[in-house]
Amino acid sequence: MNLHEYQAKELLASYGLPVQGGILAHNGEEAAAAYDKLGGKFAVVKAQVHAGGRGKAGGVKVVKSREEAKEVAESLIGTNLVTYQTDANGQPVNSVLVCEDMYPVQTELYLGAVVDRSTRRITFMASTEGGVEIEKVAAETPEKIFKVTVDPLVGLQPCQAREVAFQLGLKDKQINEFVKLMTGAYKAFVENDFALFEVNPLAVRENGALACVDGKIGIDSNALYRLPKIAELRDKSQENERELKASEFDLNYVALEGNIGCMVNGAGLAMATMDIIKLKGGQPANFLDVGGGATKDRVVEAFKLILEDKSVQGVLINIFGGIVRCDMIAEAIVAAVKEINVNVPVVVRLEGNNAELGAKILNESGLKLTSADGLNDAAEKIVAAVNA
């Protein structure tokens, strides 16, 4: 689950991090009032969406009057912002953050942290190249990124934060200020189950003080059950409609750009299914894992979800019966096809627990369902049916 910039800044500020002042506005009048309240020579109006690249897409504007703040806010709110991180439809802008005048600054730095799966620990990354995409820095000048891995038994040590401060070229009081900032960020990361933390840029102001000009936070969705206050910050308008609906039924769904819908039990088998569809010349329309403990209701909902995508021209169902019984899946498929007006070819491959009984149920259903003998056969049949 991702947070908006204003939510991330509020959370980080509660842990003692110095953040750029800002006021949230939902319309032009509120933006104009926010400009007056901030009282600077100019302000920055930022569209609040769950996507990077806002500046290049026109979602971040410098304004020099209350009238301009109102005009920019009204031009953004109610529209969809398309960036390099969104699809062609973009993300809806429901509010803007009117931020204080902070420039000129001495320099812009970068500070971020992720859960590093290779070391199974939290790893901080810092760079003197702030204000640009860290991926670009990593690709072109990786030597300018400094990394610190945190031992979970002892936590982030002040000496580690000081070492990063030295590498960033900070001096005197700035070092202690940075140590406080980094240790606060670590505490926030652990206590709120962050998956991603990023401040870009971390500005060194003209007076030498540090300030978080932007804030990006991703929360581990698996931990939301123990983070009720964080869960309340979820903005469902920023999520894919079908992915959101899938989460309500505990289905793992990711929309793709192909035309062959996939329903599979198990993430590994789902990825293998997409691979073989590609190998046979097809394009998967989605990743959909109904899980090892799939129920009849979940399979019906999964089928509905796939067919809601108008680009789907065929469906491949690939089930390995281990925990789940193939006959139960077959009954659910028959129920779903009868309930929904299915006018695309459906190929079903069942293996494992009660697979023969499941195939019998499908064959005796009287519906236009094609059985497959093995994954290779299933992929060939669905690709041929879609291309027919």
UniProtKB/Swiss-Prot annotation:
One of its GO terms (biological process) is tricarboxylic acid cycle. ATP binds at K46, G53, R54, G55, E100, Y103, E108. One of its GO terms (molecular function) is ATP binding. It is an enzyme of class 6 (ligase). It comes from the Bacteria. Transmembrane segments: none annotated. Binds 1 Mg(2+) ion per subunit. Pfam families: ATP-grasp_2, Ligase_CoA. Mg(2+) binds at N200, D214. Its EC number is 6.2.1.5. Substrate binds at N265, G322, I323, V324. Its cofactor is Mg(2+). Pathway: Carbohydrate metabolism; tricarboxylic acid cycle; succinate from succinyl-CoA (ligase route): step 1/1. Heterotetramer of two alpha and two beta subunits. Succinyl-CoA synthetase functions in the citric acid cycle (TCA), coupling the hydrolysis of succinyl-CoA to the synthesis of either ATP or GTP and thus represents the only step of substrate-level phosphorylation in the TCA. The beta subunit provides nucleotide specificity of the enzyme and binds the substrate succinate, while the binding sites for coenzyme A and phosphate are found in the alpha subunit. This is Succinate--CoA ligase [ADP-forming] subunit beta. It comes from Neisseria meningitidis serogroup B (strain ATCC BAA-335 / MC58).
